[in-house]
Structure formats: C-alpha cells, structure tokens
C-alpha cells in the first residue's frame, strides 16, 4: 500500500513540476513605467497629497485603443510625485482620483520605457506655513490659507505634527486654530 501511495505522490509531484514549465504565459514582462509629479497649474508648485495608503490619492492608468476596461492602479506619494515601474509600453490615459484638487486631473502618455508625465491641475486651497523655533524650543507658526476658487470655502484649518514622516489626521498630534 505504501508503495502505491509513494508512486502516486511521485507522479503527482512530476505533474506539478511539468505544469510549471509550460508556455502558457507567453507575454514578456512589462518593460515600461511612468513617473511624474502633480503640479498646481497656476503656481507650478507640486501639490501636497494625503499620506499614501488606503487614504492616499489613487493614480489609474487606462490603456487606450486595446479594448481593455480595467485600470492599473497605484498611489501617489505625499510630496505629489508618483511612480509605477511595471507597465507595458503603449498609450495610456493617466488619472489622479480623489485628490485635493478641483475637477479632473488627467493626461495622456505614450509609455516607451521609463516615461515621465507631469499632470497639472488646480488645488482646493493653497496653504503657506512659516515656522520658527525659539531657543527654548517653542514653535511660532504663521500660516496663510486661501481657496483657489471663490466658490469654495475653508471651514477648518489644523496644524498637525508627528515625530515620523507621513503625518495625517489619523496619526498626528493636533493644534486647531479658528480663523
């Protein structure tokens, strides 16, 4: 009985090994990629993004002229840059979704190797911050917060900080100011 089980297991193992060496996957690995920055259309400054992760800005690549309906998704970084290094060469529409900007943020790119594509849009607001630290380690903050569009209204401005990079409202210390 053991001999039959051993022969069966050996045959099963041989089938698994042969299955791993077939030519079913006949596509070469992706040979292109995209990288770039999302800029403020009016100031040419990078637009800060939410912390990457489940709450970060989703970047989506839609392949054009192939009938493909699914997108290739990845996240933008907090400094407004983005990168995906494993994309097939071809024509794509790239879109930033659910970001801190007004309207649609998208562009078109022909990927041929590692390709740079920068996107330009209008942010919801422009916030400048000046921080000074006194000799006794006290912070003085001066900020200016303006909306980019008269129809938008700022209702709350918060200063948040953390000891590690990647601060957001879920992992920060807060100081809220009324305007």
Regions found by a protein language model. Give the residues of each.
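C-terminal motif of bacterial Sec signal peptides marking the signal peptidase cleavage site
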Residues: 16-19
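A short, amphipathic beta-strand motif
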Residues: 32-41, 80
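A short, solvent-exposed beta-strand micro-motif common in secreted/extracellular proteins
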Residues: 80-84, 90-101
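Short, ordered, surface-exposed loop/turn motifs in non-cytosolic proteins
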Residues: 43-67, 152-157
């Amino acid at each position: 009985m053991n001999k039959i089980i051993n022969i069966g297991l050996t045959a099963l193992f041989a089938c698994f090994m042969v299955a791993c060496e077939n030519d079913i996957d006949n596509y070469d690995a992706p040979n292109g990629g995209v990288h770039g920055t999302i800029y403020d259309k009016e100031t040419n400054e990078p637009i800060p993004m939410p912390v990457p992760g489940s709450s970060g800005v989703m970047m989506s690549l839609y392949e054009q002229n192939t009938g493909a309906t699914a997108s290739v998704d990845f996240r933008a970084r907090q400094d407004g840059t983005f990168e995906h290094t494993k994309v097939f060469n071809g024509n794509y529409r790239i879109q930033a979704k659910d970001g801190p900007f007004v309207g649609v943020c998208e562009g078109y790119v022909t990927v041929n190797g590692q390709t740079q594509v920068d996107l330009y849009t209008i942010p919801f607001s422009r916030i400048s911050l000046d921080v000074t630290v006194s000799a006794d380690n006290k912070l003085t903050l001066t900020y200016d917060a303006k909306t980019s569009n008269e129809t938008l209204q700022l209702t709350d401005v918060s200063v948040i900080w953390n000891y590690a990079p990647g601060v957001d409202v879920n992992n920060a210390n807060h100081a809220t100011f009324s305007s």
